[in-house]
Amino acid sequence: MKNFITYYLILLSAFISAEIKEHQGILATLYVQDSAEYYANSINVYRSAIDKLPSVLSDKSISAAIEQKEDFQDKPPAVILDVDQTVLDNIAYQARLIKTRTYYPEGWDEWCMEEQADYIPGVKDFLDYATELGVAIFFVTNRTANLEEATKNNLEDLGFVFKEKRDQLLMKGEKNWGSNKNSRRSLVAKDYRIVMMFGDNLGDFIDGSDNKNSSEHRMAVTKRYKQMWGHYWFMLPNPNYGDWENSIIDFKYSTPKEEQLQIKIDALDTK
């Protein structure tokens, strides 16, 4: 009888955790998948970047990368983009997690290897325009190195042409690269002037130590660089996941899901 009760409680806990995940993720997933508002916002971000690009190219005194401090004025221009929810739309994977009541990273590699992610709205027009103006395109992603071929295939299937003589797709773990993207931005900055950057997470723009920090610290850093937003830095919305969420739980990923939900509820500001 005792063993049966223990087994029942384990099943109940798993069911509750799955329900909590669905509760937290379903509206965000539907917003990205189905809302006209999400589509319009993404188009707006990339159209704004298209409008800004000529003036940014002409002003060689500016770099978009905080790692690039000097001697960049005469280097050829480049842009850096994150991949997931910035260039490639993986919202179908989020929908799978909800329907199967599972959690990332379960099924993630398999999804990537299907090579069927679509472009985020607006990004194709930007990539085409930047290429037309002679701007090199680099993707700095925290997809792991084993997914490089699948990611490249997916992008090529969507029409992107890898034309630089050097690696344009810089993956986590490809070399001695962790999740902090500053070393990969610095690598690009050795040979190019970085004129714009795009992402859906603060770490796509700043050092990881500032990104993986409290919500208050992240907001302070964001405000510190307010002159960059909309000119050189372009943020895509991602209500599904990111370090904005992790900062609320203090990056304590092992905290039980029920406790994580309560922490998030407690963080709500009702004025």
Language-model regions: role of each:
Residues 54, 58, 93, 128-136, ...:
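Sec-exported extracytoplasmic/periplasmic mature domains
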Residues 109-138, 145-146:
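Short, acidic loop-to-helix structural element flanking the phosphoryl-transfer center
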Residues 76, 87-118, 132:
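Active-site neighborhood of HAD-like aspartate-dependent phosphohydrolases
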Residues 17-81, 250-271:
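Non-catalytic pre-domain segments flanking phosphatase-related domains
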Residues 47, 148-271:
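C-terminal cap/substrate-recognition subdomain and adjoining C-terminal extension
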Residues 57-69, 137-142, 164-167:
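Surface-exposed patches in mature extracellular/periplasmic domains of secreted proteins
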Residues 1-26:
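Bacterial Sec-dependent N-terminal signal peptides
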